């Protein structure tokens, strides 16, 4: 699942920026992990190790999910599906709304992004409240995909996002867990 001494090496590579984007928030910055080639390779290998069964597509959530999705897809012999902010994809799309702290946002995929029944692994850098990830699952399922697993570098378990995904039948894996927000 997450953490333990097994991933202490990766935890050390993730920078914490206090009070960003607002007071009281501890921003977990993976750019320092990405700068380290051994850390990046290790994170990718460990994310790959938690994948269960065959996968047809790896769906990366914009933007940092795009970092890990192609590497995982190549290793799994799968395609990459990009989940973008609404309005960023040309052509026909389907979209799903999700709530933010102060409003609503929307994500989208192309209408032909996945075949009905496609087995999809959802990937992002971090899960907090799970709003974006849950919207991504709804969107993919609306497109006919079978989403049964999600993989993250970081989980903020106190915010409940991973548990919310589990309640929707998703197996959730994260490399490290951090306390707080």
Feature annotation, model-predicted:
Residues 1-181:
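PRPP-associated nucleotide enzymes
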């Amino acid at each position: 699942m997450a953490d333990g001494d097994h991933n202490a090496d990766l935890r050390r590579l993730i920078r914490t920026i206090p009070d960003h984007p607002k007071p009281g928030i501890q921003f977990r910055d993976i750019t320092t992990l990405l700068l380290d080639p051994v850390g990046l390779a290790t994170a990718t290998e460990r994310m790959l190790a938690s994948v269960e069964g065959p996968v047809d597509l790896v769906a990366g959530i914009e933007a940092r999910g795009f970092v890990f999705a192609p590497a995982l897809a190549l290793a799994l012999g799968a395609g990459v599906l990009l989940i973008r902010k609404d309005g960023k994809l040309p052509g026909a799309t389907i979209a799903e709304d999700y709530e933010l702290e102060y409003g609503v946002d929307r994500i989208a995929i192309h209408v032909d992004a996945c075949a009905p029944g496609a087995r999809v692994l959802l990937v992002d850098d971090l899960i907090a409240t799970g709003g974006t990830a849950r919207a991504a699952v709804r969107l993919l399922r609306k497109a006919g995909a079978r989403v049964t697993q999600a993989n993250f570098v970081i989980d903020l378990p106190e915010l409940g996002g991973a548990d919310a995904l589990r309640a929707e039948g998703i197996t959730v894996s994260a490399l490290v867990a951090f306390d707080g927000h």
